[in-house]
Amino acid sequence: MDLSYTVGMSRYILMSIQTRYAEKIFRGEKRWEFRKSLPRHSKDDELTVVVYSSGGDRAVIGEFRVGRVMRCPLDELMRLTGYDTDEQAVQWFSRYYAGRKQCGALEILASVRYDQPISLSQLRQVLPAFRPPQNFRYIWPDSDLAAQLSEMSAICPDILSKLSKPRH
């Protein structure tokens, strides 16, 4: 597995997201995905999140393109994401990020729900050791996961070529 990191690449990550939040992403109701830890990301990278819905459906259901990646103190994150005037949100995020100096969020720019979700059982038929990530995992171009997602996905059949080519 190639773990090298080249700036300016198209990057894909598989991220577990609770079903209720994943649904909001694909309905266009959620603009930010808040995380305690974020993937390595350069401003020159094009980052796409492949969504594993971790609820009852337990399936890869779509993807979204990432805009800004925020790593900053909570008060700044609340201001930048527009939640600073919502007292309930500030309280919730204060508990969620308790004890952290830096908080993270991914801006959701464009989302696409797959016509055919890829179930956990389908993935395990071809990748028996597959375990959904607790948070996220990189989808490396030469990985079995990339090959299977490419083969199974109607939306992104050329994921392997996208993963391995620098953007211009």
Predicted feature locations:
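Short conserved beta-strand and strand-loop elements enriched in small hydrophobics
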Residues: 47-54
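Contiguous surface segments at macromolecular interaction interfaces
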Residues: 2-13, 17-43, 56-61, 69-168
